[in-house]
């Protein structure tokens, strides 16, 4: 039976996180302490140092030889069940698509375990778990390890597979089956392209004597010339050569859609920004925000042209300076921008009515646009005679996707922190080696700030968004149902199937009811696959997560 003391322990663990988030929100919305440029600096620190070091701290201090394999099996089975059901739906239903498979998989299986899960589950089940021989904090760390190393990598694989399909369909609609190899230039880090999506990539085919094609993928001439124009607007002290970045972190994006080069930071009007933030009306007044059909959102003119927002970026573009003039809504990237469509006039601020199906546009049957801000894309269903569009051999596509996923992973600091944490924990617990005190203290002084800074950063993100519910009420309700009902239900079934009972079963179910993870939203933003839905799931889900998890906690404790 849950007592008042138990609830107090839970609130003691979780309320401080919401205090940090609320302070950040108030600092921007009400008190006007931070400008968007300052927010980007805070979040750059969080993305580069605080969160990776926090991950390293938790993973490196977790005993890998005492992992609960049955608990991990339940978590893995849940994700495999959801993935299999979604794949079957896409295969058998005309309303299914790869975009929706990715989005629904993210919503139902990838919670915010690192930031919310560890403190919340410790507060709920620290005593009961210890009595049952299950450390709830350690179990959450084990889930974090699998998320960082396996499931986020799988997400990247699916996103790059989607990008590869679109690239091949658009540029080789009739000859794709003849492709025997791909070579990708080193400055291309994603098949999603840059601000214009796959349109910013060009593929050059070389036909051999055997009739087979060998394709080279590089940035398009127009995107390179845009980059040159962007460099021309910079200070003479800056180099004209592209600067390669292997960092990952935060970017600032303008709410206005524009394809004109924008000098970095020079056009921002802080007074107007605070004016806009103060009145709280900018989300509803945004022209084109709810545009339907095939209409593009109209550019917003007037005082609101300088309002910016930021997203967390899990990977960086190889040309960080170029991003200042990308088609990504007049973006100002504070460091290595992601290669995504962050505000393209083809639908970055528009969303369709609540529907899973693709709608035929008046321009023709081959142009279809997924609901909720997914990239408008050419998706030929057949070749005009009812046959599916041909694709290159599976081995060729797999090699191409693996190359792109590898380029993403090596630019993500969380990849290094997770792997180094696993390696050190294996060495430390196998041979009893302790980390030198100087190194341990150097890490802990930053990792100790990780939880608070991560929540503070999330509060800044919420304050800079035009609307909390960005995808419409219907889609938001559906996303919350998937996040807080479907995910825990499938986890309960998977846990029972592998034999979890008692406290372990309760921990597994509550863990599945945590708010939406940040990283899936970052990926959705970079690849422009329903980013409004994931944004709503992160922001609104965080607001309602505490009462929902408390309800699960109380019901399971009856």
Curated annotation (Swiss-Prot):
The keyword Lipoprotein does not apply. InterPro entries: Auxin_eff_plant, Auxin_Efflux_Carrier, Mem_transp_PIN-like. Signal peptide: none annotated. It is a multi-pass membrane protein. GO terms for molecular function: auxin efflux transmembrane transporter activity; identical protein binding; protein homodimerization activity. Residues 28-38, 90-100, 160-418, 464-479, 524-537 are cytoplasmic. Pfam families: Mem_trans. Keywords: Auxin signaling pathway, Membrane, Transmembrane, Transmembrane helix, Transport. Residues 214-243, 277-298, 356-390 are annotated as: Disordered. The chain crosses the membrane at residues 7-27, 39-59, 69-89, 101-121, 139-159, 419-439, 443-463, 480-500, 503-523, 538-558. The keyword S-adenosyl-L-methionine does not apply. Expressed in roots and shoot apex. Residues 1-6, 60-68, 122-138, 440-442, 501-502 are extracellular. (indol-3-yl)acetate binds at residues 51, 112, 114, 152, 518-519. One of its GO terms (biological process) is auxin-activated signaling pathway. One of its GO terms (cellular component) is cell periphery. NCBIfam families: 2a69. Belongs to the auxin efflux carrier (TC 2.A.69.1) family. Homodimer. May act as a component of the auxin efflux carrier. This is Probable auxin efflux carrier component 1d. The lineage of its organism: Eukaryota, Viridiplantae, Streptophyta, Embryophyta, Tracheophyta.
